[in-house]
Regions:
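Generic anion/oxyanion-binding catalytic loop in active/binding sites
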Residues: 69, 98, 147-150
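Glycine-centered helix-coil hinge/cap
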Residues: 88, 130-131
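Alpha/beta enzyme core
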Residues: 1-96, 103-125, 158-161, 169
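C-terminal extensions of enzymes
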Residues: 123, 131-171
């Protein structure tokens, strides 16, 4: 996480003896250089952090407010278009999480510039109730909803979204 969320006591968590605090640009560059895999920074919620991740060499970012754990934080879909514009023609991928519970939510994120979405809490209930089959049903339903909205708005595939399919009010 680019912005590790502290515990509810206002202090940073300690994981394996390391305090989880804010991540500097140099920290991020080090993480990217140490990894043999494409590095993804999660918890990006500002243009400044997106540009920091780009400068550090991250392959992708996840625009996220940790599902509401950051009180008063901007919603990921509100800041997503600003981040997309700031990154310009960068080949860094942009993913979004937080509240991606339906295919309609995924549609909005893709229309606003995301390359993909992450689904977490949306699959927990089906997983607990029906196991793997519940997750498969949920994901199939989300895909159907996404395809439905794409059909209604003339979007031929997820690579060809036209951001005018949504009315976005800039901040």
């Amino acid at each position: 996480d680019i912005d590790h969320v502290p515990g509810t006591n206002g202090k940073y968590d300690v994981v394996d003896g390391f305090p989880m605090g804010m991540v500097s640009l140099q920290d991020l560059k080090d993480y990217v250089s140490y990894s043999k895999l494409p590095f993804v920074a999660k918890g990006v919620l500002s243009v400044q952090d997106a540009l920091k991740a780009k400068e550090a060499g991250c392959a992708a970012i996840v625009v996220s407010h940790h599902h509401g754990r950051l009180p008063f934080a901007i919603a990921p879909l509100q800041v997503l278009p600003l981040i997309k514009d700031a990154l310009g023609d960068s080949d860094m991928k942009i993913f979004v999480d937080c509240g991606m519970d339906t295919g309609y939510d995924a549609y909005k994120a893709l229309a606003l510039g995301a390359d993909g979405v992450s689904v977490g809490r949306g699959i927990l209930s089906p997983l607990l109730k029906e196991g793997k089959d519940g997750v498969v049903k949920k994901m199939n339903k989300m895909n159907e909803e996404l395809q439905e909205m794409m059909m209604y708005t003339g979007v031929k595939d997820v690579k060809h979204f036209d951001k005018t399919v949504l009315h976005y009010l800039p901040l």
